[in-house]
From Swiss-Prot:
Purpose of the protein: Troponin is the central regulatory protein of striated muscle contraction. Tn consists of three components: Tn-I which is the inhibitor of actomyosin ATPase, Tn-T which contains the binding site for tropomyosin and Tn-C. The binding of calcium to Tn-C abolishes the inhibitory action of Tn on actin filaments.
Molecular functions per Gene Ontology: calcium ion binding
Additional record remark: This protein binds one calcium ion.
Gene Ontology CC: myosin II complex
Keyword Metal-binding appears in the UniProt entry: yes
Record-listed Ca(2+) binding positions: 130, 132, 134, 136, 141
Matching InterPro entries: CALM/Myosin/TropC-like, EF-hand-dom_pair, EF_Hand_1_Ca_BS, EF_hand_dom
UniProtKB keywords: Calcium, Metal-binding, Muscle protein, Repeat
Domain spans labelled EF-hand: 8-43, 44-79, 81-116, 117-148
Presence of keyword Calcium: yes
Organism from which the protein derives: Todarodes pacificus (Japanese flying squid)
Family note: Belongs to the troponin C family.
UniProt-recorded name of the protein: Troponin C
Lineage: Eukaryota, Metazoa, Spiralia, Lophotrochozoa, Mollusca
Superkingdom of origin: Eukaryota
Length: 148
């Protein structure tokens, strides 16, 4: 579900952006982005950050302007919310609180999603998800399945 980012969150992000805009040019160096996200209590992996820089810094200027950072900020907040919701769903399905869900519960979930999957398609998804063949799915496997 899309996250609604409050005006305060945008203002906080903009203030943080300005603090990291060392030359007061309305832009932050690509190298400074990690610190900028950290200052907003958001963790972005180096690989993800590089992917975003490649996408947003189309002209290879070495900087990201506020308009582009705002897009990245929204994306990161949405990703974090999606992760929270996914973890919450996993905890509900982890009936024994052991960090795994049974593949039969996963089968039920996949049928319930209403994606018109037939039994063979569901079994293929389970086989791809339960990579270690344990008959259970841990959070990493579940996340990979649900987030694609």
């Amino acid at each position: 579900m899309p996250v609604v980012i409050s005006e305060k969150q945008f203002n906080d992000a903009h203030q943080a952006f300005k603090l990291h805009d060392k030359k007061d040019e309305g832009a932050v160096s690509n190298k400074e982005l990690t610190n900028l996200f950290k200052s907003l209590a958001l963790h972005v992996s180096d690989d993800k950050l590089q992917q975003w820089v490649d996408e947003m810094d189309e002209d290879a200027t070495g900087v990201i302007r506020w308009e582009k950072f705002k897009i990245l900020f929204e994306r990161k907040v949405q990703e974090d919310e999606d992760e929270r919701e996914l973890r919450s769903a996993f905890r509900v399905l982890d009936k024994n609180n052991q960090g795994v869900i049974d593949v039969e519960d996963l089968r039920w979930i996949l049928k319930s999603l209403g994606d018109d999957l037939n039994d063979d398609e569901i079994q293929d998804m389970i086989n791809e998800t339960d990579t270690d063949g344990s008959g259970t799915v841990d959070y990493e496997e579940f996340s990979a399945l649900m987030l694609g």
